[in-house]
Swiss-Prot record:
Gene name linked to the record: opgH
Compartment(s) where it occurs, according to its Swiss-Prot or TrEMBL record: Cell inner membrane
Superkingdom of this protein's organism: Bacteria
Gene Ontology BP term (one): glucan biosynthetic process
GO CC annotation terms, alphabetical: plasma membrane
Pfam short name (any one): Glyco_trans_2_3
EC code(s) of this entry: 2.4.1.-
Biological role stated in the UniProt entry: Involved in the biosynthesis of osmoregulated periplasmic glucans (OPGs).
Name the record gives this protein: Glucans biosynthesis glucosyltransferase H
Entry GO MF terms: hexosyltransferase activity
C-alpha cells in the first residue's frame, strides 16, 4: 500500500500552519501559603459565588448523624463485656470506614430526590460572542482514535450556527517516535477533511514537563490569551456539539463562572469489566453525581476533562507550583484537576457540576489490570494532595474534595485493617484463654461477650447504606418505562443489576489489595511513572495473570485458612470477600475477555441506553476511526521522511518552534547527546541504529537537527558510490 502523503507529493499542509500565531500570556505559579494580590476577586453578579448553606447542613449533618448512631451501636456491641484493645481498634476503624460511606449515602439521597423531581433544563440558547479553544491532550495514544474523534466533532460543530466560536487543538506529549510520526500523518489527513470548515491545529512538545497539566499550561502561556474559554477533553472523549455549545453559552452568561464540569457517560465498553463499569456509571452514577452537584453548588470539582474553564480564571489562579522534595509526594502535581478547581474557587470564581447536561462521553479501562495501572497513578496523585490540603484560603468544600480523593484510596487499607482486626478478635476468642479475673479485685468474673443481635442489626444497616446508591439508581430506572423497554424490559434490567453487583463484589477485594499495595509502594517512595493507557483490548496471557495476581491468591488462601481455624461459620461469613481473591486469575481473564463481553452485549445484559441507541456523534467517530486505521496502515517513519524532501518540509511545518535560547544558558543532557550523535554520524542508517527512542523523538522534534540529518547520505554504501 502506498502512503497517500508520498503518493500525492505532499509538501504543504492544507489549511495553513500547524498552529496559529502565538498570543503570549502570564500563568504564574500559585503560592500555596498565601493568596495572590487581588484574590479572592469580587463577584460581578449578586450571589455569583454564594451557595445555600442548608444543603451542606443536610448532607454533611445527616452523614455525621447516622455515623454517630452507627459508632454508638458498634460500641454497644462490645460494651457488654468491656472494651479490649483489639475491640478499640475495630471500633476506630469501623468509625473511619462508616463515615466514608455515610457521606456517599446522604449525597445519594439528595441525588435520588433531585432526579425524581427533575424538570427539563431551561433553554440557554444565545449567540456566542466569545471564543473557545477545545483542547485534546494526547500521550502515546492510537492516532486513529484521537484524530477520528476530533475530525468528527469538529465537522459536526462546524455545521451549527456557532461553529465559528470554536477552534480545535490536538496537544501532543507523545514520546514514541513512531506514534509521533503517525500523529503527523493523521493530522495531514485531518486537515484534508477540515480545511475551510473548522480550525484544527496540532502541536507536539519536545519535552513533556509536568505531564498533562504542563501540556495545557504550555498552551495557555503561548496561545491561551486568544480565547475566552478552554474546553478540555481527553484522548477517549467524545462530546455532542449541542453540549459544547451549551457549556460555552453557560460560561458566557455567567461572568463569575470559572469552571463547569459535565458528568461523562461511559461508552464503547467491549470487555465484561468495561461493561460492568459502564452499566454502574450509567445507572447508579447519576444518583451520586447529581447529589454531589446539588449540595456542593458553586464549590464543585474538576475531573480533568469534559469540562469548560474560563481562561482568565485558569491562567491567573491555577498555575501549579512545583512541590518541594522528590516524587511521589514532591515534584510536579500529578492529580492536577482537583487542585486547579480548588485554586480557581479560592480566587473567587465558581466551580459547578452540570449534572443536567447530557451528551458528554468517555471510555473506561478494559480489565482489572488496566484499572490497577490507572489507579496506581491516581493513587499517587491523590495521596500527594496531603501536601496541598492545608493551602491557605481554600474553601472547606474544596478541602473536602481533596480529602475524599485521598480517602478513595486510603479506605482500602482501612477496610483491610478492619477485616484483619475482626479476624484477630475471633481468633483471640477461640484460642486464647480469657482472663476471667483481672488484676483489679472483683467478686465477679469478666466474661468476653458481645451483643450478637445488635452486631447483626448493624451489619444489615451498613450493607443497606453501602448499596443505597445502587438501589436508588435502580428504582429510578424501574420507574422509567421507556428506558426499561429500551434496555430489554424490567426483568433484564434486574438481571443486569444483579450481575453487576455480583461481579463488583468479586472484584472489590482484589481492588482493595491493589490499592493497599499502591499506598504501601507510595509510602516507600516509589514513583508511578507515566504509561499510556490501553483502551480497547484488556486480555493478557495466563502467565502474566498468574504473576500479577499471585499475592491476591496467596492473601485469599491465608485469610481463608485463618477463618477456618476459628470455625467453618466464620469462613462462610468471609467467603464473599475471599472467593474473588481465590479465583482472581480466572476472574481477571474472564472480565478482560472481548468474546465474553460480546456475549453479554448480544444478550443485552449490562446494556446502557447509549449502547442500544448509540448517539450519532459516537457512531460517526467509530466509522471515521475505521477509515483512519486503513489510511494509517503504512506508518510514516523516519526513513520515509528523510528519503523525500517534500515530507521533510511537511514534517518541519508541523513541528513546534524552537524556543529562544539565551547565550550561556546550560544545554540539557538530552539535547547535548542528540547533537553529538548527529554530528558524529556518517550516514542516516548508522545514526538511526545508534539513536534511542527518546533521542530519535527529540531529533524528530528539532528542525535544525532533522535538517542536518537530511544532509547525511542514506547509508555508507551511498557515500562510497
Amino acid at each position: 500500500m502506498t502512503n497517500p502523503m508520498v503518493e500525492q507529493g505532499a509538501s504543504q499542509l492544507m489549511g495553513g500552519s500547524a498552529m496559529p500565531p502565538e498570543q503570549h500570556g502570564e500563568m504564574p505559579e500559585q503560592n500555596l501559603k498565601r493568596l495572590s494580590e487581588g484574590f479572592p476577586r469580587d463577584a460581578i453578579q449578586t450571589g455569583g459565588v454564594k451557595s445555600c448553606s442548608w444543603r451542606r447542613v443536610f448532607v454533611v449533618g445527616f452523614a455525621l448523624l447516622i455515623s454517630a448512631f452507627a459508632i454508638f451501636e458498634m460500641r454497644g456491641v462490645f460494651l457488654v463485656g468491656g472494651l479490649t484493645p483489639i475491640e478499640y481498634a475495630v471500633l476506630v476503624l469501623f468509625a473511619i470506614n462508616f463515615c466514608w460511606i455515610a457521606l456517599a449515602f446522604s449525597s445519594s439521597i439528595a441525588g435520588f430526590f433531585v432526579l425524581a423531581s427533575r424538570k427539563p433544563a431551561p433553554n440557554t440558547e444565545q449567540p456566542l460572542t466569545t471564543r473557545t479553544a477545545i483542547l485534546m491532550p494526547t500521550y502515546n495514544e492510537a492516532p486513529d482514535r484521537v484524530f477520528a474523534a476530533v475530525e468528527t466533532m469538529a465537522l459536526a460543530l462546524a455545521k451549527t450556527e456557532h461553529g465559528h466560536a470554536f477552534d480545535w487543538f490536538i496537544l501532543s506529549d507523545t514520546t514514541d517516535p513512531e506514534v509521533a510520526l503517525s500523529e503527523e500523518q493523521a493530522f495531514w489527513l485531518l486537515r484534508q477533511q477540515t480545511a475551510g470548515k473548522a480550525n484544527v491545529y496540532y502541536r507536539r512538545r519536545r519535552k513533556n514537563i509536568a505531564r498533562k497539566a504542563g501540556n495545557i499550561a504550555d498552551f495557555c502561556r503561548r496561545w491561551g490569551s486568544g480565547y475566552d474559554h478552554l474546553l478540555v477533553l481527553d484522548a477517549d472523549s467524545v462530546m455532542q456539539p449541542s453540549t459544547m455549545i451549551s457549556l460555552a453559552q453557560r460560561m458566557q452568561s455567567d461572568p463569575d463562572a470559572g469552571l463547569i464540569q459535565t458528568i461523562p457517560a461511559l461508552i464503547n465498553g467491549t470487555t465484561l469489566m468495561a461493561r460492568v463499569q459502564q452499566f454502574a456509571a450509567r445507572i447508579y452514577g447519576p444518583v451520586v453525581g447529581t447529589g454531589l452537584a446539588w449540595w456542593v453548588q458553586k464549590e464543585g470539582n474538576f475531573w480533568g476533562h469534559n469540562a469548560i474553564i474560563r481562561t482568565e480564571a485558569f491562567m491567573s489562579a491555577a498555575g501549579l507550583p512545583h512541590l518541594s522534595g522528590r516524587p511521589p509526594f514532591g515534584g510536579h502535581i500529578l492529580s492536577h484537576d482537583f487542585v486547579e478547581a480548588a485554586l480557581i474557587r479560592r480566587a473567587g470564581w465558581s466551580v459547578t457540576i452540570a449534572a443536567d447536561l447530557s451528551g458528554s462521553f468517555e471510555e473506561c479501562p478494559p480489565s482489572i489490570i488496566d484499572l490497577a495501572v490507572r489507579d496506581r497513578r491516581w493513587c499517587q496523585g491523590n495521596l500527594q494532595h496531603s501536601r496541598i490540603i492545608g493551602t491557605k484560603g481554600l474553601h472547606w468544600i474544596s478541602r473536602l474534595h481533596l480529602t475524599t480523593g485521598i480517602m478513595s484510596y486510603l479506605s482500602s487499607p482501612f477496610w483491610l485493617l478492619l477485616i484483619l482486626s475482626g479476624l484477630l478478635l475471633a481468633l483471640q476468642a477461640h484460642f486464647i484463654r480469657p482472663e476471667y479475673f483481672t488484676e483489679q479485685f472483683s467478686l465477679f468474673p469478666t466474661w468476653p461477650v458481645m451483643d450478637s443481635a445488635r452486631a447483626l442489626q448493624l451489619f444489615y444497616i451498613t450493607m443497606g447504606i453501602l448499596f443505597s446508591p445502587k438501589i436508588f439508581g435502580l428504582l429510578l430506572l424501574m420507574f422509567d418505562g421507556e428506558m426499561c423497554r429500551t434496555l430489554g424490559g424490567r426483568l433484564r434490567v434486574i438481571l443486569s443489576a444483579v450481575t453487576e453487583i455480583l461481579l463488583s463484589a468479586l472484584v472489590a477485594p482484589i481492588m482493595m489489595l491493589i490499592h493497599c499495595g499502591a499506598v504501601v509502594s507510595i509510602l516507600f517512595g516509589r514513583d508511578s511513572g507515566w504509561a499510556p493507557q490501553r483502551r480497547d483490548d484488556g486480555s493478557l496471557p495466563i502467565k502474566d495473570l498468574l504473576y500479577r495476581h499471585r499475592w491476591h491468591m496467596t492473601a485469599g488462601v491465608l485469610l481463608g485458612y485463618a477463618a477456618m481455624l476459628d470455625s467453618w461459620t466464620l469462613l462462610a461469613w468471609m467467603s464473599p470477600a475471599l472467593i474473588g481473591l481465590w479465583f482472581s486469575v480466572p476472574l481477571s481473564g474472564i472480565t478482560a475477555s472481548y468474546t465474553i463481553g460480546a456475549w453479554f452485549k448480544q444478550k443485552r445484559i449490562l446494556a446502557t441506553p447509549e449502547e442500544i441507541e448509540t448517539p450519532a456523534i459516537v457512531l460517526a467517530a467509530q466509522a471515521r476511526r475505521d477509515e483512519y486505521v486503513v489510511d494509517l496502515q503504512e506508518v510514516w517513519n523516519a526513513r520515509m521522511v528523510l528519503a523525500d524532501h517534500n515530507l521533510i518540509a511537511l514534517h518541519i511545518a508541523m513541528m513546534d518552534k524552537l524556543p529562544s535560547r539565551q547565550p550561556g544558558t546550560a544545554i540539557e543532557p538530552l539535547d547535548a547527546v542528540a547533537r553529538i550523535k548527529v554530528q558524529e554520524a556518517e550516514s542516516q542508517e548508522s545514526l538511526l541504529a545508534l539513536l534511542t527512542k527518546v533521542e530519535l523523538s527529540y531529533v524528530l522534534g528539532n528542525p535544525l537537527l532533522i535538517q542536518q540529518v537530511a544532509k547525511l547520505p542514506p547509508s555508507l554504501a551511498n557515500q562510497t558510490v
